[in-house]
């Protein structure tokens, strides 16, 4: 990956222009380049700064679809989880999940055990092709009451009989996984530019003649031409097409504001836990009475979620009000009374929009969106070279993007081959065993950083870690980590020079581990100083960049409009945006 080059968007007519640099757009760009297409990818903010960045970090294997008797989705989800464990083993790994059982109707071992048995039988091929044993998904098992209380002593003991344990996938860093797809596409010749917003489709003769793109860093505009335009802008996709869709209503539908938050609690083990929430799934055929809330170890913190709310406002306005956050905390405390969470325990929150089912704005028991929306606008609006993909599940992004690129290829050249992303490892994934890679990194950084920092470097960059460490030899950057962190000083420079980081927030939230769970402390000032040197900021700009990052950690009365990411523009303003 090289430095940002907005001018390259005006260099030629591309085969496909992908709008949206989240997981769906990144997967589509990677897929199209592997099929030999020339690709441009534009993102209005930073790559993976919206919905994709703020997910719950799970790569789901489809067990939830048992209660819907939707075996097709179950099998597809399991297959995609397996592929991510193979194609990006440094960024995805198994996580054990505990589901407590009780001597109550629909919450006992018999029903849950039957479900686990069926799931294991339906997914016997889940580890096919996964070379690293540490990345394989084990069979489910049961533990007794004493053992589950040993793991989670704050569980309510009344009627508790034990627990089931199943394994799912967890992303180490969702933003870096998206970046791995973007970087892989660029290695194959794609042009990718962040802070480049698609403002308007320029139509003529029942086709998109060009797309007007604005550079948020300079205010410049360019008209990008492509044979096919793939709109993968997530919840912003309908707004881009609002004028086109005004009379058709093809893109209308409800969106869920999915929310989760990070708290100052640290489990002494790697197990997540699924607790009974207060809402039900009206589409479930077989149900354990309520939807699950998850508490998951997340670095040195705990991630809690997910809560859903029908959202009808603009995606730029996504927010969580303080009273909502208090209700979320109360619900967790009710499910696990001994936990005793308070508002002061919350270090960060994430929220964003995903397509939902048909729901009224005041509904509490909500219907999930079941499948991504893939729209051929030749049929929907008579625009022959426009395709829209609005994704639902991060896990399914690769497969859904492949379907979208199939449609793109049919419009360009039906003889183009099938997708290869199901078997092509991402950049940095060229290793057999992650523990061996981490050991190699530890040896390389011996004397300047500990094992935790070495492991983090291996997770974030895979075999590309050497390109990061090489920058530490420059005296003005220096070796070792930022104060009190596992982030190497060289990672800041690498983010700017090789990964298009344009703002301090890009570095802190999406390129490094500095703020994956909470405020990075003194390391933030050091990172700002390094970024200022790399990007040529004056003191006023450095302070402004710091202020934007600091606002991300406001919890409480001022949190109502504190969106997870902002787009700093030339006038010094900040446009709110979010995602989950």
Predicted regions: what they are:
Residues 174-176, 184, 245-305, 309-523, ...:
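C-terminal catalytic lobe of FAD-dependent flavoproteins
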Residues 33-53:
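Glycine-rich FAD pyrophosphate-binding loop
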Residues 129-134, 139, 149-188, 210-212, ...:
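Helix-loop-beta segment of a Rossmann-like dinucleotide-binding subdomain
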Residues 12-14, 218-228:
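Core beta-strand elements of the Rossmann-like FAD/NAD(P) dinucleotide-binding domain
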Residues 57-151, 290-293:
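Dinucleotide-binding Rossmann-like beta1-alpha1 core, especially the glycine-rich loop
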Residues 231-246:
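Flavin (primarily FAD) binding-site architecture
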């Amino acid at each position: 990956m090289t430095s940002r080059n907005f001018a390259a968007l005006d260099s030629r007519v591309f085969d496909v222009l992908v709008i949206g640099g989240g997981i769906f757009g990144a997967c589509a760009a990677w897929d199209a380049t592997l099929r030999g297409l020339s690709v441009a990818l534009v993102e209005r903010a930073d790559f993976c700064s919206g919905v994709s960045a703020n997910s719950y970090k799970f790569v789901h294997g489809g067990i939830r679809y048992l209660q819907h008797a939707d075996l097709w989705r179950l099998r597809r989800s399991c297959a995609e989880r397996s592929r991510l464990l193979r194609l990006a083993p440094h960024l995805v790994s198994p996580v054990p999940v505990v589901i407590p059982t009780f001597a109550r109707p629909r919450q006992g071992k018999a029903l849950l055990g039957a479900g686990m048995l069926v799931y294991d039988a339906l997914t016997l091929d889940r580890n096919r092709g996964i070379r690293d044993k540490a990345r394989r998904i084990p069979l489910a098992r049961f533990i007794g009451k004493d053992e589950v209380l040993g793991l989670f002593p704050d569980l309510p003991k009344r009627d508790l009989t034990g627990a089931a344990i199943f394994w799912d996938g967890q992303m180490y860093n969702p933003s870096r996984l998206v970046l791995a797809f973007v970087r892989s596409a660029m290695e194959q010749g794609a042009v990718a530019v962040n802070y480049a917003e698609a403002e308007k489709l320029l139509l003529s003769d029942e086709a998109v003649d060009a797309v007007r793109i604005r550079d948020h860093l300079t205010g410049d505009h360019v008209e990008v031409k492509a044979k096919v335009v793939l709109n993968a802008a997530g919840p912003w996709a309908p707004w881009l097409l609002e004028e086109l869709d005004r009379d058709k209503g093809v893109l209308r539908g409800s969106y869920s504001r999915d929310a989760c938050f990070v708290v100052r609690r640290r489990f002494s083990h790697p197990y997540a836990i699924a607790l009974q929430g207060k809402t039900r799934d009206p589409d479930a055929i077989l149900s354990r009475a309520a939807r699950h809330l998850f508490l998951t170890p997340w670095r040195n913190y705990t991630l809690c979620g997910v809560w859903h709310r029908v959202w009808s406002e603009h995606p730029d306005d996504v927010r969580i009000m303080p009273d909502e956050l208090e209700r979320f905390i109360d619900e967790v405390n009710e499910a696990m009374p001994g936990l005793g969470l308070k508002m002061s325990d919350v270090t960060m929150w994430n929220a964003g929009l995903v397509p939902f089912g048909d729901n009224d704005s005041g509904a509490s028991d909500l219907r999930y969106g079941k499948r991504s929306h893939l729209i051929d606008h030749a049929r929907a609006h008579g625009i022959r070279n426009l395709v829209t993909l609005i994704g639902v599940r991060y896990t399914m992004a690769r497969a859904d993007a492949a379907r979208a690129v199939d449609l793109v290829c049919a419009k360009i050249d039906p003889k183009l081959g099938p997708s290869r992303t199901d078997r092509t490892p991402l950049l940095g994934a060229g290793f057999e065993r992650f523990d061996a890679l981490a050991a190699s990194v530890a040896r390389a950084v011996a004397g300047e950083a500990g094992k935790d920092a070495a492991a983090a470097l291996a997770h974030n960059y895979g075999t590309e870690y050497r390109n990061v460490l090489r920058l530490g030899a420059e005296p003005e950057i220096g070796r070792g980590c930022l104060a009190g962190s596992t982030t190497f000083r060289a990672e800041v420079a690498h983010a700017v020079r090789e990964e298009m980081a344009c703002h301090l927030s890009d570095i802190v939230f999406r390129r490094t581990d500095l703020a994956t769970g909470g405020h990075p402390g003194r390391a933030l000032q050091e990172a700002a100083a390094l970024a200022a040197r790399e990007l040529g900021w004056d003191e006023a700009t450095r302070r402004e960049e710091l202020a934007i990052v600091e606002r991300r950690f406001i919890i409480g009365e001022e949190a109502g409009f504190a969106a997870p990411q902002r787009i700093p523009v030339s006038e010094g303003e900040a446009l709110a945006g979010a995602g989950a």
